[in-house]
Amino acid sequence: MEPSAEIPLGKGKETGRSPLIATRRKTGLVKAKIKTNSSFSMFRRADTMRTHAQFTNITVGWKSLCPITAEGQVNVAIYHESTRVPVLNLWSPVSSSWKHLATGSLGFVSLNHCPYVVEGRISGFEGEEAGLVTLTLHLDTGLESDDIQKCRLFSEHPELAGGSLYLYTSYTSSPIPDSNLPALRTEIDDTIAAIWRMSGGKMSITTSHALGLIATFRVKIESLLGEYPDDAFSAQVENLVKDFLLVSSTAEITRSYRTCLAKVLSSMTTYDKKYWDTIITGPSSI
């Protein structure tokens, strides 16, 4: 087998079982049905570690099947079973398609079971088909498909076991949902005000940075920091805010969310252009 091969993680009418390494005629589509604000897993994590067989890199991608106005976000994380730190941890709007390549000497812990956990999460929607996750291993020379046994796809939700494997979301068929913009603007302004208040006026962030925090973490800043009295904003908490800003400024979702938002705005005729253009074109890094 050539050093580049794809993993088919369920295809067609297969019911949760497929070989880890695909033939040339197969694609590397991952499909799983989940509910709103829920999560799914596609590989089971093993409890033991064995000898490694190496490959050089891994590519994960998301092909959106939704229109640009789709609400909600998708998170795909890939864990090697030797660590709890993800090899990849990607966030994006459901409506944005992407591919990401991770390089390095990644390894199979054993040749007779799946060494990776692929975990996903979608939030903010439910209903119609969302898209397809693809996963590709670029193998070292000498590793044959027959060396690796089958992996079992599974969901952590028992009611979904054995069902058709599709990742579900929802989208609106109505006109551009401009009514969502006031709510997003309120959340942006509230985030800025909360950090200003909790710092006693010592720390402020831009609207662009606030959007990054909202898009990345999907919770209010008070929930990230915990409840602190107005006079108890410490250097430690200030450092936490800076850490959150660093994460959001480098996250895939920050870039793709801006792109998605810009496309939505370009389809609208009436909106506060000055306010939103500042956010779209504002600094994404700290």
Swiss-Prot record:
This protein's record includes keyword Transport: yes
Keywords, in A-Z order: Host-virus interaction, RNA-binding, Transport, Viral movement protein
GO BP field: transport of virus in host, cell to cell
An annotated Gene Ontology molecular function: RNA binding
Role: Transports viral genome to neighboring plant cells directly through plasmosdesmata, without any budding. The movement protein allows efficient cell to cell propagation, by bypassing the host cell wall barrier.
Family designation: Belongs to the nucleorhabdovirus type-1 movement protein family.
Protein name, UniProt field: Putative movement protein 3
